[in-house]
């Protein structure tokens, strides 16, 4: 079986799933103290990179997604599956795990 190279342009979420690029955290505090990775709070904000087509209701009708690529979102802290592509980190979430669009 051949190895597959993944990049963002080749990932298309299925159903009501959303691919979100995780926002980078500051490496140091406002007081200038550098934080080790173990002391950093897990980020809950990111930018939507790709969205699935939506999910189907009981009658089979497609319910379109409310999100679109480019939306900045707040999502549940422990939701989704984290994916690392190159040097960037992403999280694959179900639409229900998105709490809000950040304006």
Curated annotation (Swiss-Prot):
The lineage of its organism: Bacteria, Bacillati, Cyanobacteriota, Cyanophyceae, Synechococcales. Heptamer of 7 subunits arranged in a ring. Interacts with the chaperonin GroEL. GO terms for molecular function: ATP binding; metal ion binding; protein folding chaperone; protein-folding chaperone binding; unfolded protein binding. Keywords: Chaperone, Cytoplasm. PROSITE patterns: CHAPERONINS_CPN10. Together with the chaperonin GroEL, plays an essential role in assisting protein folding. The GroEL-GroES system forms a nano-cage that allows encapsulation of the non-native substrate proteins and provides a physical environment optimized to promote and accelerate protein folding. GroES binds to the apical surface of the GroEL ring, thereby capping the opening of the GroEL channel. Its main location: cytoplasm. This is Co-chaperonin GroES. The gene is groES.
């Amino acid at each position: 079986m051949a190895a597959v190279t993944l990049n963002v342009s080749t990932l298309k979420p299925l159903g009501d799933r959303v691919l979100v690029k995780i926002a980078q955290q500051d490496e140091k505090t406002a007081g200038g103290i550098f934080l080790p990775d173990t002391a950093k709070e897990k980020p809950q904000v990111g930018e939507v990179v790709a969205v699935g087509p939506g999910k189907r209701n009981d009658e089979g009708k497609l319910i379109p997604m409310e999100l679109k690529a480019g939306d900045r979102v707040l999502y549940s802290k422990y939701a989704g599956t984290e994916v690392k592509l190159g040097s960037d980190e992403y999280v694959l979430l179900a639409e229900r795990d998105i709490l809000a669009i950040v304006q």
